[in-house]
């Protein structure tokens, strides 16, 4: 496919970095934001990248974006979501918190709480929350990934020993049929155990997750009680949420 040089360069930069904002691309190519928006719209229509509010990302169904890039993506939206999730958690509660940069933001937002018991397979979450003397933090055993996530059968077995008040979970994608999707089969198995052993499940998902592809199916959206997001989901997902009485919190 023959593309104009700037559009070809946009694709190469987005693939390398995972995500770029419109402002970054406008500065990079010395053009106006309106010009970049037109380029992004044309490339998205051809399926060459994914358009998001304020930027664009390279979308793969088999490989997630690098951890450091994910941590920078949708940072403001994740912070608002994290604060909203934390506001739903009372003091003296027991929690599961799974792998993800959004759940790490939630951990930081929980630091003003008191007397929480947290079970996690996320080393970054554990490091953040263990700083509070009145928090009890339990960490699953298993294989430690480079992003601080812990996976494997040992992690599943550990999680299954508990029954907690709340599961605070993130996800890589939500398909239009309501499927919750992720990239790592082993991570999904731990997340399934987390959901199965919580009384209430809160899914923190910024708007980039709606319609995003990933290769491993965790289960249907009916598994969760609440979805906390920065934007309403597409109509098909919204209908499924209403059908299964999944509450939507917008921030």
UniProtKB/Swiss-Prot annotation:
Cross-referenced PROSITE patterns: HTH_DEOR_1, HTH_DEOR_2
**Top-rank taxon:** Bacteria
Gene Ontology MF annotations: cis-regulatory region sequence-specific DNA binding; ligand-modulated transcription factor activity
A GO BP annotation: negative regulation of carbohydrate metabolic process
Instruction: Output the InterPro entries linked to this UniProt entry.
Output: Carb_Metab_HTH_regulators, DeoR-like_C, DeoR_HTH, NagB/RpiA_transferase-like, Tscrpt_reg_HTH_DeoR_CS, WH-like_DNA-bd_sf, WH_DNA-bd_sf
The UniProt function text for this chain reads:
Repressor of the glycerol-3-phosphate regulon.
The identity of this protein, by name, is Glycerol-3-phosphate regulon repressor
- Species of the source: Pseudomonas aeruginosa (strain ATCC 15692 / DSM 22644 / CIP 104116 / JCM 14847 / LMG 12228 / 1C / PRS 101 / PAO1)
